[in-house]
Amino acid sequence: MSTQSRILVLNGPNLNLLGLREPAHYGSQNLEQIVNALTTQADALGVEIEHLQSNREYELIEAIHNAYQRIDFIIINPAAFTHTSVALRDALLGVDIPFIEVHLSNVHAREPFRHHSYLSDKAVGVICGLGADGYEFALNAAVKRLRSN
């Protein structure tokens, strides 16, 4: 990588409640702690991250659109939009930026409606059920992929 790679980290609805909401599923860390750890990790890896959490689908879509020709990789936890948003899928396909889908909980061990993802078949990879560590693993995988290309 000749210039510093830029990675966009997107978090969907209700993830602003991490640490409060259903800690048995989502863990006790809040989103600020997760993003701070990712920022430290990114600095050590020599990459730059940008972060956005939104409960509004259109804001996530606009962030994806604005990433075009500016961002090298996306890490996304679409949260509930995983199971409902064709629009997020289309935005990701439209900008053609590789992405990894992350989920804190194991969505396949939960309610049946959580088993389907509109994004996973287009993702470079999917990490689920590993809690906040999933973001760390996703960042390592993204950097490794960027450095090998």
UniProtKB/Swiss-Prot annotation:
Belongs to the type-II 3-dehydroquinase family. The keyword Amino-acid biosynthesis applies. GO terms for biological process: amino acid biosynthetic process; aromatic amino acid family biosynthetic process; chorismate biosynthetic process; quinate catabolic process. This is 3-dehydroquinate dehydratase. GO terms for molecular function: 3-dehydroquinate dehydratase activity. PANTHER family: CATABOLIC 3-DEHYDROQUINASE. The active site is at 26 (proton acceptor), 103 (proton donor). Keywords: Amino-acid biosynthesis, Aromatic amino acid biosynthesis, Lyase. It comes from Aliivibrio fischeri (strain MJ11). SUPFAM superfamilies: Type II 3-dehydroquinate dehydratase (SSF52304). Catalyzes a trans-dehydration via an enolate intermediate. The gene is aroQ. It catalyses: 3-dehydroquinate = 3-dehydroshikimate + H2O. Homododecamer. The record marks 21 as: Transition state stabilizer. Substrate binds at residues 77, 83, 90, 104-105, 114. InterPro entries: DHquinase_II, DHquinase_II_CS, DHquinase_II_sf.
